[in-house]
Amino acid sequence: MKYNLAFKYRIYPNKEQELLINKTFGCVRFVYNTILYTANKFYEETGKNKIITPASLKSENQFLKEVDSLALSNAQLNVKWSFTNFFQKRAKFPKFKSKKKSVKSYTTNCVNNSIRIEENKYLVLPKLKRIKLKYHREIPKNYRIKSVTLTNSNGNYYVSILTEFEKEIQKVTSNDKVIGLDFSMSELFVSSENQRADYPRYFRMLEEELKKLQKSLSRKVKFSKNWYKQKMKISKLHEYIKNCRRDFLHKLSKKLSETYNAVVVEDLNIRGMSQALNFGKSVGDNGWGMFLRMLEYKLMFLGKQFLKIDKWFPSSKTCSRCGNVKDELKLSERSYKCECCGIEIDRDYNAALNIKNIGKEILKY
């Protein structure tokens, strides 16, 4: 069976390459906006859909010939996908890309080995040739490169290399190495073995520093050089928080996937929960959704089970010893006291035990 996996690296282009990369960012944005504009105009005039090609724009815009043609073709595909997602009610109507606000990126495809790693320190790309690469994680030889996305984040350049590979995943035989995880606002999760993730809460740790930077930004003249410099500082701190969170979650999900043969969690509506309970910052800080995605694909590649149980299952209200279900349990009550069997147990630990038990029933372990 075929699978896809992306590898992200930092690259170090020279001045000429950096100039061409930034020129490609601009050309891709220009092509996207032009195709979107003509599509909107044609629909208003005729009531029909029409997506023009990047090739039709090159005669009047000679600068488009200087950059990677596949990057321009992918911009056209992005317009098509934007309309498809809109008509299928998965996204809002496509918007034009701003030079200042939009993410600077472009995607190019591998054709006839046009994209490859050389000497474990260079990445060969169309038009750009050899770029210095921080090759900290090796791509297996049986993985075929499909495409590369270049991005600029706070002045640093990165590539995300999408690969395709074939793998026959051997399912791990059933045994008792099952763990249940109950979502915790402050600690990420509490497990059925009464382990706590002890998530460092990076955003909360640096929130005061962010406030100071944002306060300083508010005092500067908008769109001035100093305003942009201050905005860059804020952006870099946000990126640092994001990278710390991602690193922590990768290591934690790897440890769990290697230790257990099945992981059971609740299928929670995190976005709705954060809006309803005004816990947006705390929910966003711990990255629960990102953690589950990491855990799912790592378990899958190892032939292990990842199970989401119904979000309406009363894991917190149910007694893990006798099965009694409470009519009501306030969020402020941090321990579970059962009226039937008399057990008193940590609320989150009790919920994790229930999640594990229902998961074992479903998986027939």
Identify what each model region corresponds to.
Residues 1-365:
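Nucleic-acid substrate recognition interfaces
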